[in-house]
Amino acid sequence: MYHLHPCETLRQVFAARPFQGAEPERASFIFVGLDANYSPDIEHSAIFPQLLEYLSDGVAFWRKTGVHHPFLLPAYGNKDGAKYHRAFASIGFRPEHAPLVSFVELLHLPTYGQSKLAVGDLDAVHLRWVDRVIRAGSARYVFIPGSVASRMRQSGCFPWLPREPESEGGSLGVWQRTTTTTVYCHYHLSTHGWQEKKKREQIAEIRALVKDA
């Protein structure tokens, strides 16, 4: 179950480009999530114009502002989503990496509140597109948390995705490795507590991949 975001403008912009950042088909780094979640009153936020600008052209936004997401703008403060994007920023991507980085969600619609996605909530056409992006696009590195991978397996649209990632000795697990693309398993970037140490180790390993990009 999910709560469809009430802002019509946000829904329209997201429908035209159901991803965030660079075009996924051309990106080298793809981060797969469950849904794009926003505050229910985001339309009245000081950063709403910048959010629409970002969703319309994430690459241009990053180059213009120096931050990869409007939730990192000072006017947004410490509201929902800021923690995730601060953790993401610690990876070390810079504005010149903007054309290489994309965020793709399993749900094709923007949401608000707490989502508990079931397979029936997901659109098969969108999921097949996600599969093509991962397996037939330009991605060198794809990052899928375990909770997201679980929904992907349940959908039946990703038969290549194993039940458990392989360990290659580092903190990142590996869902799949081909001659062109490595699909990694990592902790969600908003996790904390006992997962924090390993999450930081995983971020350091992703940072090393960025240096080679």
Model-derived features: where do they sit?
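Extended, charge-rich low-complexity interaction segments
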Residues: I134-V142, D212-A213
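A polyanion-binding, active-site-adjacent surface
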Residues: M1-S138, S147
